[in-house]
Amino acid sequence: MAIHLVIIDALNLIRRVHSAQPDPTDIANTIQNTRRTLQRIISESHPTHIVAVFDHLGSDRGWRAEILPEYKQGRKPMPEPLLNGLEKIQEAWWQLGIDSLLSEGDEADDLVATLACKVAQHGEKVTIISTDKGYCQLLSPTLQIRDYFQHRWLDQPFIEQEFGVKPQQLSDYWGLTGISSSQVTGIPGIGPKAAKEILSQFDDIEQAFLSPDLPKKYRTKFDQHIELARRCKRVSALKTDIELGFNLQDLRFTANEAR
């Protein structure tokens, strides 16, 4: 039987559902609405395997903050009622047949990326449910990203229209432009238009930096900030080699599974 693994970026989904509520303290409503959302996702995607991946909620900002100390500094914490309700949300999802994977020190993004790539590399179909465009660097013939809330696929045509680069160049793109929401600065003075121009001429940051053909208007910026660009690229790239400690069979989904 053909495999279709659906990976839910859990907090990405929960936060969006919760933020649309008139009463942020009504976690019972959050549970109900996320269950409805997941039921629609299951109905539309027909998974054979499914899992929800949650970020760890400790104070440790992980390996990216070691490379770039300002990474995700100053982000608003999760609302306390929602934080206190996460276990109930996970229980409600478990009753639907969806297990939760909680990261321990790693960001959920890296766990999602590792699991998705391991399965896709064997030629099996993987769908990541998330609005996070960072996952687009993983795109492959059997790995796709679905923005459920905008009802769109974050596919290669979307990336070309949105950023003007190839999926495999996205970490270089963000190494140049930065990611403001994560406090990733990039090279000062290089924005999306310049990054698109550079990456249409060169494969990546290193090739551009080493080339005598790099336009003069960018040479000084590269010479002054190349190490920063390298660090920003590293934190923008997703890890795909985390030890998972379980196998795909553990994630098998059965519709209307009795729990």
From Swiss-Prot:
Region annotation (Interaction with DNA) ranges: 189-194
Residues that coordinate or bind Mg(2+): D109
SMART domains associated with the record: 53EXOc, HhH2
EC number(s) reported in the record: 3.1.-.-
UniProt key word Hydrolase: yes
Stored SUPFAM superfamilies: 5' to 3' exonuclease, C-terminal subdomain, PIN domain-like
Gene3D superfamilies: 5' to 3' exonuclease, C-terminal subdomain, 5'-nuclease
Superkingdom to which the source organism belongs: Bacteria
UniProt cross-references to Pfam families, sorted A to Z: 5_3_exonuc (PF01367), 5_3_exonuc_N (PF02739)
Binding site for K(+): L176, I187, I190
Alphabetical UniProt keywords: DNA-binding, Endonuclease, Hydrolase, Magnesium, Metal-binding, Nuclease, Potassium
Record-linked InterPro entries: 5-3_exonucl_a-hlix_arch_N, 5-3_exonuclease, 5-3_exonuclease_C_sf, DNA_polI_H3TH, FEN, HhH2, PIN-like_dom_sf, Xni
Cofactor note: Binds 2 Mg(2+) per subunit. Only one magnesium ion has a direct interaction with the protein, the other interactions are indirect.
Cofactor(s) needed by this chain: Mg(2+); K(+)
Protein role: Has flap endonuclease activity. During DNA replication, flap endonucleases cleave the 5'-overhanging flap structure that is generated by displacement synthesis when DNA polymerase encounters the 5'-end of a downstream Okazaki fragment.
Family label: Belongs to the Xni family.
UniProt protein name: Flap endonuclease Xni
Organism: Vibrio vulnificus (strain CMCP6)
Lineage: Bacteria, Pseudomonadati, Pseudomonadota, Gammaproteobacteria, Vibrionales
Name of the gene encoding the protein in the UniProt record: xni
